[in-house]
């Protein structure tokens, strides 16, 4: 394997940290029509204790008016919570994001209220993965694959008419 000295790692980290700080504080567009918010659980080594701990990495992914995706921010905390999400939303607002039309979130308690505190006009939508998971709570294990396939026909439909037809088929099944 490749041997890398601790000094080299420190120099590379120091060089990258300045760029990361600049990226994290950069100005944002005033409007992102869609912003997807999610938190991921990752293992991170604590710099002081050197102990590896599970942490939540909060992610805000904006979709621009022309459909481009842009990571708006990454934040790290001990675990996911609506209170910390509010601080993330405040950071986005302080960096120039004035309006969001639709947010896509998981079902975290208090998250929708945090969004409305920062962006009162934003519509809040539960992400499709969480919607499907919620629906599957009411389905037997043996029926779950068929239900997922039927739901996929609805949410992946190319037109409203196709989605309505798939929904009608689902209701009749």
Language model feature labels by segment:
Residues 2-6, 11, 15-105, 109, ...:
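RNase H-like nuclease fold core
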Residues 113-173:
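Extended amphipathic alpha-helical interaction segments
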């Amino acid at each position: 394997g490749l041997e890398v000295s601790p000094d080299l790692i420190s120099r590379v980290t120091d060089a990258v940290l300045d760029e990361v700080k600049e990226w994290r504080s950069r100005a944002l567009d005033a409007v992102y029509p869609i912003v997807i918010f999610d938190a991921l659980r990752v293992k991170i080594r604590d710099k002081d204790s050197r102990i590896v701990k599970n942490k939540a990495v909060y992610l805000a992914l904006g979709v621009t008016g022309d459909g481009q995706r842009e990571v708006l921010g990454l934040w790290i905390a001990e675990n996911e919570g609506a209170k910390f999400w509010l601080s993330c939303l405040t950071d986005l607002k302080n960096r120039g994001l004035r309006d969001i039309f639709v947010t896509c979130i998981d079902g975290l308690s208090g998250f929708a209220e945090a969004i409305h505190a920062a962006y009162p006009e934003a519509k809040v939508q539960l992400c499709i993965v969480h919607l499907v998971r919620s629906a599957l709570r009411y389905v037997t294990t043996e029926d779950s694959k068929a239900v997922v396939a039927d739901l996929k026909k609805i949410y992946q439909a190319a037109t409203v008419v196709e989605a309505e037809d798939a929904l009608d088929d689902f209701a009749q099944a």
